[in-house]
Amino acid sequence: GRGRGQTYTRYQTLELEKEFHFNRYLTRRRRIEMAHALCLSERQIKIWFQNRRMKWKKDNKLKSMSMAAAGGVGYHRP
């Protein structure tokens, strides 16, 4: 990532992604733990999660739209 904004190492990103996979919202305690583990500030963790949730929402919206366009797969009544 060039220009403004924080760049994260591959390891940090992987760990954050892994955590996000299990919880989209972090407790403060978990955030502190992650900040220590990844050598980031709590604020950086918080912002990463906010951005990740936005991206997730956008991706999900696209997914549900394409599902609808595909004729709502999975809604077959007998």
From Swiss-Prot:
PROSITE patterns: HOMEOBOX_1, HOMEOBOX_2. It holds the Pfam family Homeodomain. GO terms for biological process: anterior/posterior pattern specification. One of its GO terms (molecular function) is DNA-binding transcription factor activity, RNA polymerase II-specific. Keywords: Developmental protein, DNA-binding, Homeobox, Nucleus, Transcription, Transcription regulation. The keyword Protein transport does not apply. Its main location: nucleus. InterPro entries: Antp_homeobox (IPR050296), HD (IPR001356), HD_metazoa (IPR020479), Homeobox_CS (IPR017970), Homeodomain-like_sf (IPR009057). It is found in: Nucleus. It comes from the Eukaryota. CDD domains: homeodomain. Residues 1-60 bind DNA. One of its GO terms (cellular component) is nucleus. Belongs to the Antp homeobox family. Sequence-specific transcription factor which is part of a developmental regulatory system that provides cells with specific positional identities on the anterior-posterior axis. This is Homeobox protein Hox-A5.
